[in-house]
A protein has these predicted regions:
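Fe(II)/2-oxoglutarate oxygenase catalytic core
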Residues: 1-174, 182-216
């Protein structure tokens, strides 16, 4: 097996969304008064020392249905590309990933995508050092994070990982990385202009866990 680093699991793809689509989402988010100050953690608390952004979960909203559908089809395609690239980077086989919760469901397991959040950062806002791992009571543990960068006409706002990896926001770029505690990262301070991203997670739903929440 080759020598594998944490950085091998941090993978991005360029131009996954069109310029027109990205611009439309940014403009729509800018004008949507339902956005709210972002919350953090399983307890969904407000902590501006950690996270300072405006968030909107678009998937339940009827007037965002078209955008939600485009995010869904794009995610479905590039999640598979992520797994293919990950195998190339690590030399590991699909059989390995089938037993570790990274994208290949087996034995009744389900990997749930729970929808998309649009985030807007104004100058002076950021998301400080954190990791994305939580265990949701119904959805299970998060296993994979994805981010779309919707614009790049701002300054600052890079995604930085604790190992020194830095991702420069570029319109249409999509980033994947594991949601575990080992992938501590931050969205750096935006210093000029507004930054827009869309983000979400895959959750690993074990069949035993799912059965606990079935209607009796």
């Amino acid at each position: 097996m080759k020598n594998v680093t944490l950085g091998d699991y941090i993978i991005s793809f360029d131009n996954t969304l069109t310029k027109e689509f990205c611009e439309g989402v940014c403009e729509k988010m800018k004008n949507d008064t339902r956005r709210s100050i972002g919350i953090v953690g399983r307890d969904k608390t407000l902590n501006l020392e950690i996270k300072n952004s405006y968030d909107l979960h678009i998937s339940p909203l009827a007037d965002w249905r078209e955008e939600d559908g485009i995010f869904f089809t794009t995610l479905a395609s590039f999640k598979d590309k992520y797994m293919d690239t990950l195998q190339e980077n690590t030399g590991l086989t699909p059989d390995f990933f089938a037993n570790t919760g990274y994208g290949y469901a087996s034995n009744g397991d389900v990997f749930a995508d729970t929808g998309y959040q649009i985030k807007m950062y104004e100058p002076g806002q950021r998301y400080n050092w954190h990791h994305d791992y939580i265990i949701d009571a119904k959805e299970g543990p998060r296993v994979l994070t994805y981010i779309w960068y919707l614009n790049d006409d701002f300054e600052g706002g890079e995604t930085e990982f604790i190992d020194g990896t830095v991702i420069k926001p570029e319109r249409g770029k999509m980033l994947f990385f594991p949601s575990t505690w080992m992938y501590v990262h931050r969205g750096k301070l935006v210093t000029k202009g507004n930054k827009y991203i869309a983000t979400g997670w895959f959750y690993h739903q074990h069949p035993l866990t799912n059965s606990m929440f079935e209607d009796k």
